[in-house]
């Protein structure tokens, strides 16, 4: 339970101060801070006493499935350049998050009320009745898609010391990633402000709170997201196979198997495409410095040669699996020599529902879609609270 409601607000010169934030145990130590940038501040998620800072970009992508194969390959290649370009910088990790959430669903109805001909009654006309029925049907399944790209820097990768230097490095690297995304034909809407970052966290813990937040924002157009204390759930309970936070239940899965055959750039469309459930797909990328990759592959080649010489000395035959492993190592060396970058990655999927039955139905649908994409999902039993944090814009999920 969050102690924030019982703390109250302290009045200072007639103004109410903000209560101190209290993140849940899995996120203890995470704070939302701000960095000045041009006309407005950028929101930053700070961890480990400010030694790790994360900024979040809101993005939009035109329908990838409608592009021709050449355009798809071009965009993927440019995304690869974003990752490879980060391998020798202060960037520690890059997180990609795509989430669906319940849409308001009444935009078309509001438009109809505002734009209809006053001479035509809203009720009783067969055409309008049919249209309202169609709107009512689609509203129940309408989903909003959001794409967030998190950029995390580590103080140990920044040459200059001091909190200001780390913050400056984060802003610079976030700008560079944004430029790379735009080159990949991704529309970057901008970096989230502190209030918008708090709102993004709040709607991750309780996706069904969006309607209430939208109502508040409509009544107060100058409102910029939420205060930091309101980013976290009022109550959260971890169970063996799910995590409850405020008005939502969540089940988080680890992507434990990726396609083992050649696939098209569209292979994840079955999971990321049209969906009637509330879910989040998050992939954390950790670019590996080229010198480290080169050192590892050279050691592997030396080891393979020593093993082959030893087998020849004792007259042992070479198996097909051993030959394949040696060929893979040589191929890896060739790719590094050509300038390609290696990355570590981990993927997680969080499925949300209003109650147990809703969560069960949503989980079944997501598992079916993942199977079509040749992805193996494993439920994170016994660690749902920590696993849920892996699908937040904190670039978590990989062991340091």
Language model: regions and residue ranges:
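Extended, folded cores of ATP/NTP-driven motor/assembly subunits in large transport
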Residues: 1-400
């Amino acid at each position: 339970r969050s102690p924030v409601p019982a703390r109250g607000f302290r009045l200072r010169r007639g103004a109410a101060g903000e209560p101190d934030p209290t993140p849940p145990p899995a996120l203890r130590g995470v704070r939302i801070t701000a960095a000045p940038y041009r006309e407005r501040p950028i929101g930053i998620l700070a961890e480990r006493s400010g030694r790790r800072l994360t900024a979040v970009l809101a993005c939009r992508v035109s329908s990838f499935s409608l592009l021709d194969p050449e355009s798809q390959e071009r965009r993927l290649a440019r995304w690869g350049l974003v990752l490879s370009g980060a391998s020798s910088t202060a960037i520690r990790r890059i997180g990609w998050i795509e989430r669906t959430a319940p849409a308001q669903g009444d935009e078309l109805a509001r438009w109809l009320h505002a734009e209809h001909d006053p001479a035509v009654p809203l009720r009783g006309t067969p055409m309008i009745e049919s249209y309202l029925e169609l709107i009512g049907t689609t509203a129940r399944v309408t989903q909003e898609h959001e794409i967030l790209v998190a950029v995390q820097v580590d103080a140990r990768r920044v040459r200059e010391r001091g909190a200001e230097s780390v913050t400056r490095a984060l802003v610079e690297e976030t700008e560079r990633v944004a430029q790379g995304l735009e080159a990949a034909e991704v529309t970057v809407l901008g970096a989230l402000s502190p209030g918008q970052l708090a709102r993004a966290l709040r709607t991750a813990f309780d996706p069904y709170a969006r309607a209430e937040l939208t109502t508040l924002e409509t009544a107060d157009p100058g409102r910029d997201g939420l205060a930091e204390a309101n980013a976290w759930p009022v109550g959260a309970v971890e169970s063996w196979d799910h995590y409850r936070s405020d008005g939502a239940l969540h089940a988080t899965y680890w992507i434990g198997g990726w396609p083992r055959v050649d696939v098209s750039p569209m292979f994840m469309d079955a999971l990321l495409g049209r969906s009637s459930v509330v879910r989040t797909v998050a992939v954390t990328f950790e670019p590996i410095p080229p010198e480290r990759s080169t050192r590892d592959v050279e050691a592997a080649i030396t080891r393979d040669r020593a093993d082959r010489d030893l087998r020849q000395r004792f007259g042992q035959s070479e198996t097909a699996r051993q030959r394949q492993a040696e060929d893979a190592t040589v191929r890896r060396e060739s790719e590094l020599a050509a300038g390609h970058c290696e990355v570590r990655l981990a993927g997680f999927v969080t499925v949300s529902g209003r109650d147990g039955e809703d969560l069960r139905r949503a989980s079944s649908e997501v598992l079916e879609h993942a199977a079509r994409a040749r992805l193996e999902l494993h439920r994170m039993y016994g660690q749902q609270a920590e696993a849920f944090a892996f699908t937040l814009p904190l670039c978590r999920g990989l062991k340091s």
